[in-house]
């Protein structure tokens, strides 16, 4: 008998499964609304011109390929913390933070989860919004933490369940961990408004919860990086010492380069140094040190004034295209004569939209119209273009009328 006779076939990844089925479809009108990557208005992958310029500058320098330190490229870490917390952040100025480079957002989450598993002595309990990004559960679970949920999305309004969220958060046991999406909540596209964030912060402070922020879409949600980081900065201003995961996959289009950062805001600079030493001890047996190329690209963009300015315009361009596709989809549904209210599609923010379509309607869209999405009715608005938005609206109307 074999060593691995007892190993069962695992379930396929639900999102990658959508892409596989899409690839097999021969219909010329087919649409893939499952994939979490930006597409231009011709439906093609998009490399930001600022990224191309940064790559050219890096290539011209003929740099070596030596190892980075365990914590990553120093100037990248500093620039990432400034981008997230704001250049005038008191936490930055007083040096009471530590930022390490990570293998994109997933790697940052896992480093954070591993650190909590080892050093957060108060609780094993992590509370995720319901629903949350599918990968959050295995990341925290595999790091040895216990998962729970708090209400977040209201299927009746396709919006934020503020009453349910505040009620559930108020009942979370003291000194537990709460995960918060900083902006462009994935998968729902539903974010709290600033006044609602203030109420959440009050409860987090009152219950002495540890706030764990995941910010995968800074700049990509509203088109304004400062606006998208508002909640994180507000929490820190309120004296809540958070940790934060950043990803440059979406906002710089550096998906396959795996560029991210993990930041811990501490009580003082001495605590930050101690935390940093332990983060390095966790990282070393995971992957020794992070990859070089993507961090160089991001760092070059963030630290050169001209490139940074160009990049901010390009991020706004991507965000604006997505916002415009949302409004076009809503107006096309009205044109089709749909009697349903689709306003939530325009109200939600970021790459993803929770349409409110039921699993059987999703199935019909795939079978009858070759439109692919996950069963929960989540669509990637990045897959919608001015060329196919009319077809999508027609198809949605057909399965919902």
From Swiss-Prot:
The modification 3'-nitrotyrosine is found at residue 67. Its cofactor is pyridoxal 5'-phosphate. It catalyses: L-aspartate + 2-oxoglutarate = oxaloacetate + L-glutamate; L-kynurenine + 2-oxoglutarate = kynurenate + L-glutamate + H2O. The keyword Membrane applies. It is an enzyme of class 2 (transferase). It is found in: Mitochondrion matrix; Cell membrane. The modification N6-succinyllysine is found at residues 44, 61, 78, 93, 130, 156, 198, 267, 280, 309, 334, 367, 375. Disulfide bonds: none annotated. This is Aspartate aminotransferase, mitochondrial. The lineage of its organism: Eukaryota, Metazoa, Chordata, Craniata, Vertebrata. Its EC number is 2.6.1.1, 2.6.1.7. Catalyzes the irreversible transamination of the L-tryptophan metabolite L-kynurenine to form kynurenic acid (KA). As a member of the malate-aspartate shuttle, it has a key role in the intracellular NAD(H) redox balance. Is important for metabolite exchange between mitochondria and cytosol, and for amino acid metabolism. Facilitates cellular uptake of long-chain free fatty acids. GO terms for biological process: 2-oxoglutarate metabolic process; aspartate catabolic process; aspartate metabolic process; biosynthetic process; glutamate metabolic process; lipid transport. Substrate binds at residues 36, 133, 186, 378. The modification N6-(pyridoxal phosphate)lysine is found at residue 250. The modification Phosphotyrosine is found at residue 67. Belongs to the class-I pyridoxal-phosphate-dependent aminotransferase family.
